[in-house]
């Protein structure tokens, strides 16, 4: 199933899907009684940044899975909408505290009523049952990391593969390091200079250095620079939301990387420890809205080196990266 976050909706379809979809999300949030503020924050963010409607959540009914399926299908029989809403329900369930058997049962019944694949539900089950190794492997396999590695190999072939293995082994690569350190001398206001300043500001080792990030991951860091995102846990969630908006992957899989790393405490990345409850749901879905305007997959379809010499604002304009609307935030020194 292909899910396109930038797909345009008519006003009538938007209103219909908002009624059915938000009621479905509220059904999950009410499973334990009064919805938690964290679950409500996530639902409001979906309402405001993805559905873009004005709707009082308290006025929406709770629905049985068959009622959800009927309401959504009456809006549009395209299964993409049922796929999207099942994913949204799963994310809300994860924002609502410890995974529960009641939420899992609702999600399983909903996937059956929707007649769609239950991949999001399987992810929820793995988290609930503590299958951390399976969860990590699944997320790495389906997240943006896969495309970043493939794009790096396509751009650099075997030398880049060897350099990536060196980084993962903690071995210094002088050739790679020298190339990346040359960005410090690029013109002011250039994309390349902005990337080097991003590394310096965060005290990150340059690719190629001992302790530096593997080369594929630098594509993610370039999204921080292009989109204007910082490096707190909330900002990391926001930039991954930004990526979910433009990548040709299932947005759920992209967002789940952030959920696992910064909300559920599952350390998917080998470079940073997992954290609990550090995501900002509003910021993450605002990032997804931001990324949906971008006209190119910035992970898979460009080599940042082709653009490092250009002014940062020129590169942003080329890829239709509009101003984010808030300043990036960084961890306290």
Model-flagged regions — what are they?
Residues 47, 51, 115, 129-133, ...:
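Charge-rich, low-complexity amphipathic helices
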Residues 1-178, 275-281, 333:
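Small-residue-enriched hydrophobic alpha-helices in membranes
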Residues 117, 127, 147, 198, ...:
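Generic signature of intrinsically disordered, low-complexity segments enriched in small/polar residues
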Residues 296-333:
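Acidic, carboxylate-rich catalytic segments that either coordinate divalent cations
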Residues 50, 54, 75, 92, ...:
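Short, flexible helical or helix-coil boundary motifs
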Residues 159-310:
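Core of folded catalytic or high-affinity ligand/protein-binding domains
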């Amino acid at each position: 199933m292909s899910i396109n976050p930038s797909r345009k909706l008519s006003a009538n379809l938007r209103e219909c899907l908002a009624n059915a979809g938000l009621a479905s999300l509220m059904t999950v949030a009410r499973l334990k009684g009064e919805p938690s503020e964290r679950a409500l924050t996530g639902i409001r963010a979906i309402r405001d940044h993805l559905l873009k409607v004005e709707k009082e959540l308290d006025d929406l009914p709770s629905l049985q899975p068959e009622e959800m399926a009927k309401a959504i299908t009456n809006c549009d029989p395209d299964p993409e909408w049922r796929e999207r809403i099942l994913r949204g329900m799963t994310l809300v369930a994860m924002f609502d505290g410890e995974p529960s058997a009641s939420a899992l049962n609702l999600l399983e019944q909903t996937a059956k009523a929707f007649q769609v694949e239950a991949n999001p539900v399987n992810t929820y089950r793995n988290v609930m049952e503590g299958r951390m190794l399976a969860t990590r492997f699944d997320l790495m396999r389906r997240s943006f990391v896969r495309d970043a590695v493939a794009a790096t190999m396509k751009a650099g072939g075997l030398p880049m593969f060897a350099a990536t293995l060196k980084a993962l082994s903690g071995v210094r690569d002088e050739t790679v390091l020298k190339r990346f350190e040359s960005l410090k001398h690029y013109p002011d206001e250039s994309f390349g200079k902005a990337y080097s300043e991003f590394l310096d500001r965060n005290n990150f080792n340059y690719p190629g250095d001992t302790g530096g990030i593997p080369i594929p991951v630098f594509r993610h860091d370039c999204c921080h620079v292009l989109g204007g995102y910082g490096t707190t846990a909330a900002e990391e969630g926001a930039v991954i939301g930004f990526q979910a908006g433009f990548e040709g992957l299932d947005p759920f899989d992209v967002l789940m990387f952030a959920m696992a790393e910064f909300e559920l405490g599952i350390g998917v990345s080998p470079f940073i420890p997992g954290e609990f409850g550090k995501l900002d749901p509003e910021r993450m879905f605002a990032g997804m809205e931001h990324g949906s305007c971008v006209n190119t997959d910035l992970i898979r379809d460009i080599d940042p080196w082709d653009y490092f010499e250009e002014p940062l604002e020129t590169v942003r304009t080329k890829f239709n990266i509009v101003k984010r609307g808030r300043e990036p935030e960084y961890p306290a020194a």
